[in-house]
Amino acid sequence: MTVETTNSSPVPGTIDAPPSAHGLIDRSKLRTLAQRSNRRGAARLAVHLGCVGTTGTLVWLTLPVWYLLVPAMVLHGITIVTMFAPMHECTHRTAFSSRRANDLVGWCAGVLSSYNATYYRYYHAWHHRYTQDPARDPELMYPRASDRLAYLKEISGLMFWYRRAIDYPALALGRAGALPFAPAEARHAIALSMSCQLLIYLAAAVAIAMGHNAALYFWFLPALLAMPLLRGYLITEHTGCSPDGNGLSNTRTTVALFPIRLLMWNMPYHAEHHLFPSIPFHQLPALHRQLRGRLAHVAPGYLATNREIFLSL
C-alpha cells in the first residue's frame, strides 16, 4: 500500500491537535499540562534503566540454568522492547524540556528497541495527522490483520522483524524518496541515522560470531522473546476503533496495571495522547481524568482487548 500525499501537506515532523480536540480542555489548563520537565523525564528514564539493569542481573544469575534463564530473559526483554516508549515520547520532544536530551535519549532508546528515532519522528507525525486514513496513515502501509492467522503472525513479531530486515537497509541506502512523510531535506539525516544504527547491530552480530555472547543473552534473545508483548500492546491502540479522523473514537485508551504504565511512559492513555500530542507523559493521567467521559473506547485491559480483536476476526 502506498501513502498518498496532498497539496496542503503541513510542515513535516510537526504534530498539532486534531480538530476533534478543539474545545475539550480550557486553554489555560492546557498550557499548565503542556509544561515539559527535564527532571520528570530524567527520573522516569532512571527508573526504566534501573529495571533494565535489575532484570539484566537476573539473566546473568540464571545463565547456567535454562529453565530459569528463559523467564529471566522474557522479563529483561520487556524492559528492552518498552524502550520504544521513551523513543516515542522523545520524538514528540515531550520527554524532556531540552531538545538535545530528547533527540539523544530518543535515538539511543530506539537502537535498543529496534526503532530509528530520526525516521520515526516523520513517520509518526503523519500517523497523528492522518490517523485511520487508509490512504495516508503510515501505520496502514501494511494492512492490519484481517484473519486469525494474520493476527498470530503480527502478534508473534515475525512481521515486525521481517519489515525491519527489508525496510531499514533500504532507508540506510537513502531510498526514502517514495515516502511522502520523509521530506527531501530530511532524507540524508534519515539515511545517516539508519546507517549508524545498523552498524551498531552489525558490530554486535560480529561480536556474537566471534564467541562474545553478551549481546545475544542481554539484548537480542530477550528482545525476540518479549516482542510479542509489545505487539500485543500496540495492536490495541486503533484496531476496532472508528476509521475516521475523530480523535474521540479512532483511538483506544486502555486501563493498564502500574508496571505497564511505568514502562510505557503512560502511553496506555493513548486517546488522550492523540487528542493532545503536546502534553508530556507525566501529565497524561491528569488529562485522562479530564477526558475519560468523552472517550468512545476505554478498554479494561490488554488481554481482554486482544481476545476481543482475535474473536472478531
Where are these regions (language model features)?
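Histidine-centered catalytic micro-motifs
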Residues: 83-92, 120-132, 233-240, 264-279
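Aspartate-rich (DDxxD/NDxxD/DxxxD) Mg2+/diphosphate-binding motifs
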Residues: 86-104, 138-142
